C-alpha cells in the first residue's frame, strides 16, 4: 500500500467525521430552532413564560392527569394537567405514563355516552366530550407540542346567536364555574370547541376573561398538537333553570338550584363590565317596550305605547336589539318600572330589572303561555322579586300568519295540504319536543295586533305598581329549634298527656320575620303513621291519642312565612 492511498483513506475518515459532526450540529440547531419557534408560539398565546424543555419532559414523564367532580356525565367537570389536542385529528389526547391519574377511571363506561357534557345543556348528543388515549412514548412520533401556559376553561357554547342561550347556557354558567374552582379566575382563557364562528354576541363573552377567547378554528393556526398545562373541561350546570324540550316538552328544570340572589350578583358583574351604574334614586318611572323588526311584530306598537303611557302615567321607551347597543338596553332596563315584550330571547334582559319591577310577556295566537316559561321561571326565582304577567292573543282576527315563508320562519307550504289546513284551524299548539315542530313555528312567528284594553286589564289585575322591594333576608331559612324537652303525665290508667317545649332557632333573634310557626310530628314507636301539628307557641300539651305506658318519637321544626321550612331538630324520645 503506497503512502498516497493511506493518506487519502485518512483524509476521507477525517472528512466523514467532520461532516458527521456538522450534520449533528445542524440537526441540533434545527431542534433548538424548532423549540424556540414552539416557545414563541406559546408566548403568542400568553405572556406567561414557559421552559419548553421542562414542559416537554414533564409531559413525557408524567403524562396526562385527570380528576373530575360529579358522578354522572351530566354533572361532571374535569380538571386536567397536560391534556392535549390534535388540530389535525380534532381529538383531545390523554397521554399515559406511569405517573398518569384518571379519576374516575370508568373504562368502557366513559363511552356510555360520554365522559361529560361540554355545554351546560343536559345530555345533548352534540355536546359530548371524550378523548383518545396514547402512551406517552408516542410523542416521539408526533408533531412537537405547543404548550398553552394559561389555565384553560374548555367548553361549548350552545347557541351563540341567541341572547337567551348566551346568558342561560353560557355566560352565567361560565361565571359560576370560575367561582367554583380555585385555579380559575378572570386571567384564565376560554376555549370554545363547538365549531361556531364568533356569533352576534361575542363581545359579551369577552367580559368573562381578561384574555381573548379562542375558537376551535383558530387553534389550527397555533400548532398541530396543543397541550394545555392546566385545564378545566365542562361547565357547572347549577345555575340553569330551564330545559328546552329535547326529551320531554320544554319547561322549568325539575330540580332548580339557583336563586335570584345569584342571578342578581351576576347581573351586577355584567353591569360593571358595561360601565353602567345603577341609579338608586331614579327620578322618573318609565316603561320599556322591546320592539322587534323582523318577525313576531306588534302591529299596533305606537298605539300600545301611547295607551301604556296614558294608563300608567309613565313615560314609555322603545328599545330593540337591532337599533340599540346592548349597554344602552341594559342601562334603560336596569331602572325601568315595567318591561313589555313579545315572547323571545330579548326577554333574558329582564334579569337586569330592579326588584319590584313588572315583566309583561306577550304571546301570539295559539301559543299557550303556560307551555313556554323560561322568563316566568326566571322572574319567580326566590330573590328575583319581579312581578310577572303573561298575556296571550286569543282573537284569531288579530293575528297575521306567514304560511309562505321558509319553514324555519314559520312557513308551512312544504307540508301536504291536509296538514296545512289542520295547522291553520288549530286553536292551540299542543305540547311538543324541540325544535322543528311546524305548528309551533307557524304560530310563534305570527305578528300580533294587541288588544290593548285586554292587556291593560291583565296587568292591573296581576301586579301592584310601586310595590315594596323586599330584602333578601325574606328568603333566609330558620335553623333548628333548641333545647327541646318532653314531659309525660298520666291521668289514671286510660289517659296520658305529653308536654313538649323548645327554644327558638338561634338565627331567629337576628332576623325580622313576619310569621313564625312550628311544626311538630308525634309518632308512636313502631308505627308508620304520625300526627302533625302546626303551632304558634313554643310549648304545647298534647292529649289527643296519647296513651299511657307508650314510647313516642317527637320531631320539631320551625317555619318562616309559611314556606321556608327549617330542619327538624334531633328526635325526642318520650315515655308516658
Curated annotation (Swiss-Prot):
The lineage of its organism: Eukaryota, Metazoa, Chordata, Craniata, Vertebrata. It is found in: Endoplasmic reticulum membrane. This is Protein O-linked-mannose beta-1,4-N-acetylglucosaminyltransferase 2. Glycans are attached at residues 98, 275, 335, 451, 539, 561. InterPro entries: FN3_dom (IPR003961), FN3_sf (IPR036116), Glyco_transf_61_cat (IPR049625), Glycosyltransferase_61 (IPR007657). It comes from Xenopus tropicalis (Western clawed frog). Pfam families: Glyco_transf_61 (PF04577). Its main location: endoplasmic reticulum. Belongs to the glycosyltransferase 61 family.
Amino acid at each position: 500500500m503506497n503512502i498516497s492511498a493511506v493518506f487519502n483513506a485518512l483524509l476521507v475518515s477525517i472528512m466523514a467525521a467532520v461532516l458527521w459532526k456538522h450534520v449533528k450540529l445542524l440537526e441540533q440547531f434545527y431542534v433548538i430552532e424548532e423549540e424556540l419557534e414552539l416557545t414563541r408560539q406559546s408566548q403568542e398565546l400568553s405572556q406567561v413564560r414557559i421552559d419548553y424543555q421542562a414542559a416537554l419532559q414533564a409531559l413525557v414523564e408524567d403524562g396526562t392527569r385527570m380528576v373530575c367532580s360529579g358522578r354522572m356525565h351530566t354533572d361532571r367537570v374535569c380538571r386536567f394537567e397536560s391534556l392535549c389536542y390534535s388540530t389535525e385529528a380534532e381529538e383531545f389526547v390523554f397521554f399515559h405514563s406511569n405517573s398518569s391519574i384518571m379519576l374516575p377511571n370508568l373504562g368502557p363506561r366513559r363511552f356510555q355516552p360520554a365522559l361529560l357534557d361540554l355545554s351546560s345543556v343536559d345530555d345533548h348528543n352534540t355536546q359530548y366530550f371524550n378523548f383518545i388515549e396514547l402512551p406517552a412514548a408516542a410523542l416521539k412520533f408526533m408533531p412537537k407540542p405547543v404548550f398553552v401556559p394559561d389555565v384553560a376553561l374548555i367548553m361549548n357554547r350552545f347557541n351563540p346567536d341567541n341572547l337567551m342561550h348566551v346568558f342561560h347556557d353560557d355566560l352565567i354558567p361560565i361565571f359560576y364555574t370560575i367561582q367554583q374552582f380555585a385555579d380559575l379566575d378572570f386571567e384564565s382563557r376560554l376555549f370554545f370547541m363547538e365549531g361556531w364562528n364568533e356569533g352576534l354576541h361575542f363581545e359579551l363573552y369577552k367580559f368573562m376573561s381578561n384574555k381573548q377567547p379562542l375558537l376551535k378554528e383558530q387553534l389550527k393556526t397555533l400548532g398541530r398538537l396543543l397541550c394545555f398545562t392546566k385545564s378545566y373541561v365542562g361547565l357547572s350546570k347549577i345555575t340553569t333553570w330551564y330545559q328546552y324540550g329535547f326529551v320531554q316538552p320544554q319547561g322549568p328544570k325539575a330540580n332548580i338550584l339557583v336563586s335570584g340572589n345569584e342571578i342578581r350578583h351576576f347581573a351586577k358583574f355584567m353591569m360593571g363590565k358595561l360601565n353602567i351604574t345603577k341609579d338608586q334614586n331614579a327620578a322618573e318611572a318609565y316603561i320599556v317596550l322591546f320592539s322587534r323588526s323582523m318577525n313576531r311584530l306588534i302591529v299596533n306598537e305606537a298605539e300600545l305605547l301611547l295607551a301604556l303611557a296614558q294608563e300608567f302615567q309613565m313615560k314609555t321607551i322603545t328599545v330593540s336589539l337591532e337599533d340599540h347597543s346592548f349597554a344602552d338596553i341594559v342601562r334603560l332596563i336596569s331602572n325601568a318600572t315595567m318591561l313589555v315584550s313579545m315572547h323571545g330571547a330579548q326577554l333574558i334582559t329582564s334579569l337586569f330589572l330592579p326588584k319590584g319591577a313588572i315583566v309583561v310577556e306577550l304571546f301570539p295566537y295559539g301559543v299557550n303561555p303556560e307551555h313556554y316559561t323560561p322568563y316566568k321561571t326566571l322572574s319567580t326565582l326566590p330573590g328575583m322579586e319581579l312581578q310577572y304577567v303573561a298575556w296571550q292573543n286569543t282573537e284569531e282576527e288579530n293575528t297575521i300568519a306567514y304560511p309562505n315563508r321558509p319553514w324555519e320562519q314559520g312557513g308551512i307550504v312544504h307540508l301536504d295540504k291536509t296538514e296545512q289546513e289542520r295547522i291553520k284551524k288549530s286553536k292551540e299548539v299542543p305540547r311538543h319536543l324541540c325544535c322543528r315542530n311546524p305548528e309551533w313555528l307557524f304560530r310563534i312567528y305570527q305578528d300580533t295586533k294587541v288588544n290593548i284594553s285586554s292587556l291593560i286589564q291583565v296587568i292591573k289585575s296581576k301586579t301592584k305598581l310601586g310595590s315594596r322591594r323586599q330584602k333578601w333576608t325574606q328568603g333566609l331559612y330558620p335553623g333548628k329549634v333548641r333545647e327541646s324537652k318532653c314531659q309525660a303525665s298520666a291521668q289514671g290508667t286510660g289517659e296520658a298527656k305529653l308536654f313538649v317545649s323548645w327554644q327558638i332557632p338561634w338565627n331567629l333573634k337576628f332576623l325580622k320575620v313576619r310569621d313564625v310557626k312550628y311544626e311538630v310530628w308525634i309518632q308512636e314507636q313502631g308505627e308508620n303513621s304520625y300526627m302533625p301539628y302546626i303551632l304558634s307557641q313554643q310549648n304545647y300539651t298534647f292529649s289527643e291519642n296519647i296513651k299511657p305506658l307508650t314510647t313516642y318519637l317527637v320531631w320539631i321544626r320551625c317555619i318562616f312565612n309559611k314556606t321556608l321550612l327549617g330542619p327538624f331538630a334531633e328526635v325526642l324520645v318520650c315515655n308516658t
